[in-house]
Amino acid sequence: MYGNDAMLVLISYDVSFEDPGGQRRLRRIAKACQDYGQRVQYSVFECVVDPAQWAKLKHRLLSEMDKEKDCLRFYYLGANWRNKVEHVGAKPAYDPEGPLIL
């Protein structure tokens, strides 16, 4: 499903609500992550992207955040991510290579 250059990036964010724009930034950052990946916890997303998609997503996220108040973390799990992710718990595991049912 994904090319050889696809990689898994784990994205976590913390958006400040100290100013009125905080909720707007939060919605926009979450929407950008949802456009490229799957929410696995409230403010954590797994995104399987190729380098071009990652460049677009990262640019979009950085342009939405307030660098003085918000925090984004990117964890690059690379192309061999399948061997690096283990799921334990009640929620079903997300399989980005599985079938998509609409």
From Swiss-Prot:
Keywords: Antiviral defense, Endonuclease, Hydrolase, Magnesium, Metal-binding, Nuclease, Plasmid. It holds the Pfam family CRISPR_Cas2. GO terms for biological process: defense response to virus; maintenance of CRISPR repeat elements. It comes from the Bacteria. One of its GO terms (molecular function) is RNA endonuclease activity. Mg(2+) binds at residue 14. Its cofactor is Mg(2+). Its EC number is 3.1.-.-. CRISPR (clustered regularly interspaced short palindromic repeat), is an adaptive immune system that provides protection against mobile genetic elements (viruses, transposable elements and conjugative plasmids). CRISPR clusters contain sequences complementary to antecedent mobile elements and target invading nucleic acids. CRISPR clusters are transcribed and processed into CRISPR RNA (crRNA). Functions as a ssRNA-specific endoribonuclease. Involved in the integration of spacer DNA into the CRISPR cassette. Belongs to the CRISPR-associated endoribonuclease Cas2 protein family. Forms a heterotetramer with a Cas1 homodimer. Homodimer. This is CRISPR-associated endoribonuclease Cas2. The lineage of its organism: Bacteria, Pseudomonadati, Thermodesulfobacteriota, Desulfovibrionia, Desulfovibrionales. The gene is cas2.
